[in-house]
Amino acid sequence: MKLKYKSKLALAGLLMALAMPSCKKFTELSPLDKLSDNTAFSSKQNIELALNGVYWQAAVGRYNPGTGLTTGRGYPFGGASIEQGEMRGEDMVNLQAFYQITYEGTYTATTANNVNHWEQLYALINQANVFIKGVEDAVGKGVITQDESNAYKGEALFLRALAHHELVLHFCKPYADNKGSNLGVPYRTKAMMGAPDVEEGISQKRGTVAEDYAKIIEDLNNAENYLPAAKADKALSISKATKGAAIALKTRVYLHMADYDNVIAEGKKLGADVGSGAFTSPIGGYKLEADVETPFTSQANNLESIFSIAQTQAQNGGVNGAIASMFSASAFKGRDLIATSPNLYNADFWVEGDARKTKLQYIQTTGNYKMVFNYKYRAIAVLDSWNPIIRYSEVLLNTAEAYAYKGNNTQAFALLNAVRNRAVPSSKQFMVAPSDLKLAIYQERRIEFTGEGKRWGDLHRLALSSYGKNGVPAKVLSAQLTTGGLDNYKPGVVVEAKRAAIPYTDKSFIWPLPQSEVSSNPNLEQNPGYGN
């Protein structure tokens, strides 16, 4: 389906969605295809193609370096969300100019990375809304049944919620700041199909963070009710939204709200309430893989991955966006752009012999960047490494944190150990709960999810907590690592972080809205400190 108009008005990043085909074919084996307005929702087969187009927007998207649209760089979820999430934190180190602005916090309202993230997230949201309207109309025309429509809608609602939450994380203050009373983002639920829709949409102001979270939960609740527990095969059950994916994402969203009762309630649905031992979800059959490599080496067929964004050889973020290209070492034909911080790698809580250190990190001993690199994404030749959005280990650690805050240390410890003990030597396993169980859970998250883009989410939600950093932490600079090389990566070594921290009160803790949006939409209020 093509949207056949172009708007001169910037509507919350929807210029991309308004000017491009909104239905694309994106399957594991097929390239992009276009569908006309008249046929997009005229058959079940075409509806499937239209839905694949929504996933294509999530996985590949478009990119505008300031000179016009180009092929995608994996915005928003085909790599960019992971890369930006890591570069906003301190556990991975930017080595070259590619991510320097994000890493050092010098972004402005016209910086390409944050502008494109905003625009492509809203492009995804609009395509989800267009799809929802299309399948609702298809019921009235007798093309599909109401149950079939609901199942399709569930996938679009999941992606809409995921996209809005990503926007809130980067462009808004955390929920913990005055219980979400700060400026949120416009929560778009109506398809932008023509100029009247654009005019109506412009009238919508930002609202509050709390309002956004309420709508995210509403979308996920509906998605849970509509979606099946599994798809026709395992690859589709991982790469398409399912009931388990909606529940799992709710554990994350509720954790950002510090709504621990609901984190636990959702975690229980996925089997996080048994006493100890091997946890298995009654929905989807999720469980931890015995080998920490399996979710990454068998990305389309494992029991731990709940939802990932699929990439193919034909359609991916390219050399400038695909996660394998951006995170890998030159020894594997990667670009040496991002190294693991020695201050994480050497931390006493990341013990020697941990399989996530020996199997999922690579020590590069040659070339100009003798450092440690992430080794989760290995499909560098064809760039089809899938991007993990949520794994079962996150559900367990989300629920562990909630139990710890509710005073059930026994269950929190059991969940923590389930994730940790599969990776560390038996001699390094906890026999009794650490004196600060919450801290141990936070440290475990840094190890388990390094290279998966979750560091920023934790820094954001915990900014005002005693366990947080009260802003963006100080960071190690590339020059410090190139000087010392692998001597930096030794037990006990702490490299002084010379890039100054950004206090929570500084405007740069959150990104500015794109200047093009604020200038074109008088109702869209810019974040404080960035002007209008």
PLM regions: where:
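Extended ligand-binding clefts on enzyme/binding-domain cores
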Residues: A58-R62, G201, G207-E211, M257-A258, ...
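Conserved, well-structured interaction surfaces
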Residues: N94-C172, G207, L220, E224-P228, ...
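Inward-facing hydrophobic residues that define packing positions of alpha-helical scaffold repeats
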Residues: L51, I125-A128, Y213, L220, ...
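Short, surface-exposed recognition loops and adjoining beta-strand edges that mediate ligand/DNA contacts
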Residues: N38, P65-Q84, G89, F171-R188, ...
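Membrane-proximal, proline-rich intrinsically disordered regions
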Residues: C23-S81, G318, F327, W350, ...
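Bacterial Sec-dependent N-terminal signal peptides
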Residues: K2-S7, G13-L14, L18-Q45, I216, ...
